[in-house]
Amino acid sequence: MVGLTVLQILALASSISRLGYTFTIGAREAGEWVAENLPPDAVIGMKDSGIFSYFAQRRVMNLDGLANSFEFAEAVCSGRMQDFVLAHGVEFISQHAVPQNVRLGDYETYAQPYPCGLRGGPDGELVLRRELEVFRGTPYQSYVGRFEQLVIWRLDRAPAGEAPLDTGP
């Protein structure tokens, strides 16, 4: 019995010691930045948004497709995702686990994929522009040991397929 208790304590200590290097801390950092820097009525879209939402203290649209509407799924699968999120007031997109070129800031545009939850439909995407980044978090280590980073962009207000609008300073 004592051996089992010691094993449980060691396992817990090992888990806790890795928390500082994971998405949990990255999402908290980004959420706190949002709470301090974005207007109270700002709406942010994000996948895996639970921890981030708690600390952001703002409306967050879940972009996983798991806890959203059938209308959202249809928009993702039909190439109308940007129009959908804009119509629902989303102004910012937050994404973790971005590719290396995005982590390095070596990109002009990044097409963030969103899986189609409908049978046979193509995946959707949002095209995010480097010049519209508003937050770049501290790099963190994922559970599988890769370095990741959470980035937030202002969403381009131009409807899909049209030239970007001037976003000002």
What is each model feature region?
Residues 1-12:
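Signature aromatic-anchored transmembrane alpha helix within multi-pass, membrane-resident enzymes
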